[in-house]
Amino acid sequence: MQTMSSGIARPVLFLTAREGEYVLKDEFQLGSSSRSTPQITGSPLDPNTPVKRLFFMRINIAQFSRWDYPYPREYIEELKKIHGVHHVEENRDVPSILENYRNSKRKSHNFSSSNTPYLKLHRPASRAGAPLINAKSFISSLTFHDNIVRSFQPSIHGKTFVFANHEKSFYWLDVSAANSHSALLKMEFPRASPVCHDINSFTKSPKGLDVIIGFDTGDVLWYDPINFKYLRFNKNGQLNSSSVTAIKWVAGKDSQFLVSFRNGWLVLYDKYRHEQPLHIVVPEKNLKSLYLSSPGTFNILISINHRDDRKLNPVACYAFSKSPINGFCFSPDYQYLALVSERGTLKLFDFVKEHVLDVFHSYFAGLTCVTWSPDGKFIAIGGKDDLVSIYSFPLRKLVARCQGHKSWVTDVIFDAWRCDDDNYRIASVGLDRKLLLWDFSVSAIHRPKSAVYYVNHHSNNSKPAISDFDDVGDLTMGSEIDNSNYVNGDITIHPTLSRSLIPVISPITIYDVDDSPLSSVFFDPDCMITCATNGRIRTWQRP
C-alpha cells in the first residue's frame, strides 16, 4: 500500500515504459461546480435531441526554481480590503478581485472603466454566514485557502503551481506543498464555462503571473493570481459570440495572445488595449469567397500590419473557415502555426507573413489536438479517427500514423526530456481512458510496399478527391499536380492517403489511467501529469 501526501492509502499504481516505471505519486480531486450541468435526455440519433458540448479539463504549470519573494500576512490582509483601482500602462484601470467580505455586503463600487466587472469575495463555507452571490457578476465567487500565505513564503526548493479549468470553475493549486490538497484559489462563473487557458512564460515571475482564460460564451479573461487583478475581453461576445476553443500567448510578447473560436476565427488581442466596437457583416453572395478564397484558405479581416493610431483591439483577425478551429500550436521559433479543425483539416500558417502554406486532411472525421516537436521538425495531431498522426514539417508530408486508441484522442504532447536528434517520445490520452506512449524514430520508419507501388504507378496527372477540397479553397482544377499534391499558387493541398500507404507505429505502453475519460497529459522534468474529465489530476513520478 502507498500513503500519499493527501493521507490516502491506496495500492501502488504504476505504468511501465522502456526506461522504467512511472509510479503514481499523488492525486488531486477537484470538486464539482455548485451549479450542476443539466442532464440531456433523448436519443443521440434523434435530430431534435440537444447536443451536449464537451468541455475538457485543461491544465497548465508554472514552475519556479526558487521562491524568494515573500508575501507577509499583512500584505494578504491588505488585499482583502477594498482598496480602489489598480493602474497599469496606457491608462487602463484594473479592479482588484479580492475585497473585504465584511465591508462588501451589497455595496456598489464604481470603477473608472465602465467595462470592468465588480466582484465580491466569498469566504469558505466554514465561515459563518452564507455568501451573497451577485447574479449580474461574470465571476460569482472567489474562495481562497488559508495556506495561501504559507505558499508565498520563501523556499529554496522552488514552487510548482498548477492551473486548471473544470466545469464552471477555475483553480489555482500549489502541488509543491506537502500535505496540502486544497486549491489556493477557486473562481466560479455563474453563466459561463472556462474551456481553455494559458500562462505567459515570458513574463512569469514570483511578482506576477499573466494567465488568460477562454470561455464558451466567447469571453476572455486576463488574470494575475498573485496580484489579484483581472480584465475582461470580448465581453458578452461583442466581437465574436461563439465559444472559445483554444488560447495561447504569443511568445516573446508580454501582452499579446491568440484566441480561436468555434466559427473558424482566429483573433489576436493585446491586454493593454481597449476594444473597439467592430461589426463585420459579410453579404450572403460573398460568403463563398470569404471562406473559400483562391488566394488562400482563409480571409484576413484585420491584418496585423494595419494602421491603428488609436491602438485598439483586435490587433488582427482571420477567418479560416466556417468549421470550428479545435486547437492550434506555435512552432518553436514562433513563426508558424499548426491549426486543426472540426472539418478534419490541418493547416500550416505563416503567422508572420499571414499566409497559409499547406492543408492536410485526416483519415476521417474531425481533428481535436495538435502539438509541435521541441526541434520543430515534426507535428503530431490527434483526432476523432482514433489516430495520432505525425507530419514532417520540413518535408511537408505525413510520415506515420500511431494506432492504438479505441476512441477519440483528446490530447497529444511530445516529451521534451525524452527527445533527441533522431528519437522522439509522444504521449496521448483519449476518451477510452487510456494513456499511450509512443517512441518514434526517423531512421526506423519504413514505407510499406504498397506505398512504393503507389508512387511508381501514379502519374502526375492524378488529382485529389473532390472531398479533399472541402474547406480549403475555391480552386481551379487545371492547376499543377506534383506527387499527388494539389498546388494552388503557394498553397499545397494534400489528399487523404490510404492507411496502407503510411507506416503504422504501435504504442510501447497502453495504460488505463482513470475510470473516467482522459482530457490532458503534461510533462515536466520530474513527473508526468494526467487529467480526467471527472476532475482528477494525477502526478506520476518518472523512473
Swiss-Prot record:
It is found in: Nucleus; Cytoplasm; Cell tip. WD repeats lie at residues 239-279, 320-361, 362-401, 404-448, 513-542. It comes from the Eukaryota. The modification Phosphoserine is found at residue 43. PROSITE patterns: WD_REPEATS_1 (PS00678), WD_REPEATS_REGION (PS50294). Keywords: Cytoplasm, Nucleus, Phosphoprotein, Repeat, WD repeat. Transmembrane segments: none annotated. This is UBP9-binding protein bun62. The gene is bun62.
